[in-house]
């Protein structure tokens, strides 16, 4: 009994050792397989089958189970070992970088992209459209200016050619004529040009005369306005006395001949004395002047020259005062 128990213990120990060896070999082989798969891709199925057949001729189901266990345990262990070695080798800097990259990717996935790019693109597009519109406006303005300049140049050329054409036509029309007829035609053209110039001068003179007449009429109206203002002032004054109305028509008719009589006084030695016509309906034929009568006193100088100096100064001062009053009141100076 003691021997059998010792034998069984030894057999169990040997079996355990074998199993442990197999597991270690299978783990190393699985590690090599995973490394080769990661490095060079998958192996063909024929190689893996031949390798498993050559190892140990056992039952198919047992081999499957062993493979599954060994592959799962070895792959898990190898992954943990590799991850630990990588993390140890890289250190904290890699972890920080990886955490930053992960946070960035999460933010980029969760949050939408900022609109700054779109706004900048919109602004750039707006700027492009604005610059294009400005360029178009400038081109249009330049085209218009060029067209206007071309039109002005064409008009100037036409006028210049017309002037040259007139001279050329005159010369061409006179070339086939004899010299005597050419001279006559030229004289006729000169006379026509002079007549046109005379007409232009006459038109200018007429315009000037019309302007003078208008000025005189305006002055006459100014005199009438001044008289009216004076009359209104006299009426508004305290010394005004009401009077009965009298028509001025008869007064004007009777005053006109008296004015004519007073206009003719001594203006010189050769003054004319005309008898005024009677105011009645019938005019005597004897009263009509038939000849010029001279008032000649055989005097060499005017009697005003023989007045004393004091009297002449007084008359001159009175004249100046009257002129000043008329100028201030606005009435025309006589």
Swiss-Prot record:
Residues 1-13, 44-62, 132-166, 201-218, 247-262 have a biased composition (Basic and acidic residues). GO terms for cellular component: cytoplasm; nuclear speck; nucleus. Residues 1-173, 201-222, 241-290 are annotated as: Disordered. It is found in: Nucleus speckle; Nucleus; Cytoplasm. Residues 14-24, 78-118 have a biased composition (Basic residues). Residues 180-234 form a coiled coil. This is Serine/Arginine-related protein 53. The keyword Coiled coil applies. Phosphorylated. The gene is Rsrc1. Keywords: Coiled coil, Cytoplasm, mRNA processing, mRNA splicing, Nucleus, Phosphoprotein. GO terms for biological process: alternative mRNA splicing, via spliceosome; mRNA splicing, via spliceosome; nucleocytoplasmic transport; response to antibiotic; RNA splicing. Interacts (via Arg/Ser-rich domain) with LUC7L3, RBM39 and RSF1. Its main location: nucleus. Plays a role in pre-mRNA splicing. Involved in both constitutive and alternative pre-mRNA splicing. May have a role in the recognition of the 3' splice site during the second step of splicing. The lineage of its organism: Eukaryota, Metazoa, Chordata, Craniata, Vertebrata. The keyword Phosphoprotein applies.
């Amino acid at each position: 009994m003691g021997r059998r128990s010792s034998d069984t213990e030894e057999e169990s120990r040997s079996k355990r050792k074998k199993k442990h060896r197999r597991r270690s070999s299978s783990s190393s082989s699985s590690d090599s397989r995973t490394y080769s798969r990661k490095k060079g891709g998958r192996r063909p199925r024929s190689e893996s089958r031949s390798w498993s057949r050559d190892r140990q001729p056992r039952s198919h189901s047992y081999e499957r189970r062993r493979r599954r266990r060994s592959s799962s345990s070895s792959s898990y262990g190898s992954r943990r070992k590799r991850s630990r070695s990588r993390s140890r080798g890289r250190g904290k800097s890699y972890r920080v970088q990886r955490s930053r990259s992960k946070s960035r990717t999460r933010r980029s996935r969760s949050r939408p992209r900022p609109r700054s790019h779109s706004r900048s693109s919109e602004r750039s597009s707006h700027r492009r459209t604005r610059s294009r519109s400005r360029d178009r406006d400038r081109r249009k303005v330049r085209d218009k200016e060029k067209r206007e300049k071309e039109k002005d140049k064409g008009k100037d050329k036409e006028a210049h050619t017309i002037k040259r054409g007139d001279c050329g036509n005159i010369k061409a029309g006179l070339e086939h004529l004899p010299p005597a007829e050419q001279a006559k035609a030229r004289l006729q053209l000169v006379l026509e040009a002079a007549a046109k110039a005379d007409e232009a001068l006459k038109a200018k003179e007429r315009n000037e005369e019309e302007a003078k007449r208008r000025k005189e009429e305006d002055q006459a109206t100014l005199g009438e306005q001044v008289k009216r203002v004076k009359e209104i002032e006299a009426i508004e004054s305290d010394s005004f006395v009401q009077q009965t109305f009298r028509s001025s028509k008869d007064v004007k008719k009777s005053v006109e001949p008296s004015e004519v009589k007073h206009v003719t006084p001594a203006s010189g030695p050769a003054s004319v004395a005309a008898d005024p016509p009677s105011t009645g309906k019938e005019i005597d034929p004897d009263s009509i002047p038939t000849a010029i009568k001279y008032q000649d006193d055989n005097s060499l100088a005017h009697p005003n020259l023989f007045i004393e100096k004091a009297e002449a100064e007084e008359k001159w001062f009175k004249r100046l005062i009257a002129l000043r009053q008329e100028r201030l009141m606005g009435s025309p100076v006589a």
